[in-house]
């Protein structure tokens, strides 16, 4: 989401719609850290791993019942059981660890194979992307490791971390303390056995040139600034393993031919920026050379993105390492809208689930699935969610459950990764516990 308004816990977009590594240099990673990806991995330790994922000094394992994946995404050795990440010298299936290289840029990443491992995700919304006073400026608590561990214990596999960088930068240099804070949160996520997504979020709208003239046009200044920030972010995270995915933009990239926010889409500038993002990150070394990257759809909108003019960037790392970002808040009158105006032609709806509404959802996800297949790029549904509403527009609980379940199922059956937008309304910021409604939707979703 972009600039946000808090509506009963759902952040509504005004656009519509210090650790250098995963573990300390001497830390022993538990070989069973990713148990649950594909069974129970063998017990034991993988030895001491370098903070940049370089070498394993020969850990041991007592075996186990998993068919693959000792070490999980955290350790210096091992392979992710889903087949998404494969180290060259790691322990697999509870076998003993051995010595030698176990990570770094010699790993192989297959975005499509990662889909199952990424599972069901959530955002830490209205927090590190705050453009006022950062982490707690929008009434959110400080992110704690206990909260992150709680997310993992409740079944979350992916955590998206929206970030405002430019707001707090000085002369184009990202604030060092804020960079370290983001790195700390990412380290907690990966140590808990989950995947992290870090982006440049709305951040005041500079990517879209929202305050420029003409607005919503791509300028050389924007391109230079964008590349500069991704050089800094890429360098800072170069030693963090492939369980970190970098995302170029949020709901930006919505440049138009007439300078209007909702004007005629101008897709070539978005293609150019997606290419700039991929090329810039790949050049920053370490894991960036081959990590999975998430490129932006046009305003992350299905119908505006799934068109011939939208193209997938050329990746210096080869094919199969990119995801496409799409968000889903249809119908917005049910999921987001909080105020009716006089003679409003699109009034708020407090219920969802008619045959027509279900057909719209299925049609859009079918289109998205076809788009993914045609463009040969898997999808991360980086945001979806529905407000609880306030009187007199409180959303019916059964409808909220039905909508969240339908979106999650439509995603899972098509190999799309669903990532909930949450600001503490559905998931406790203390221990990661789910609301009763989200729990029902989560329980009903099974990934193939």
Give names to the regions the model predicted.
Residues 1, 5-107:
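Ser/Thr-rich, Pro/Gly/Ala-heavy low-complexity intrinsically disordered linkers and tails
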Residues 88, 96-158, 173:
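N-terminal carbohydrate-binding accessory modules
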Residues 124-143, 169-172, 211-218, 333-359, ...:
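Acidic/histidine-rich helix-loop elements
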Residues 125-130, 158, 164-169, 202-206, ...:
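Solvent-exposed loop/turn segments at secondary-structure junctions
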Residues 139-159, 169, 173-202, 206-248, ...:
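An active-site-proximal structural segment forming one wall of the substrate-binding cleft
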Residues 220-357, 363-386, 406, 413-416:
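Active-site region of glycoside hydrolase catalytic domains
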Residues 391-448:
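Aromatic-rich peripheral "rim/lid" segments of glycoside hydrolase catalytic domains that contact
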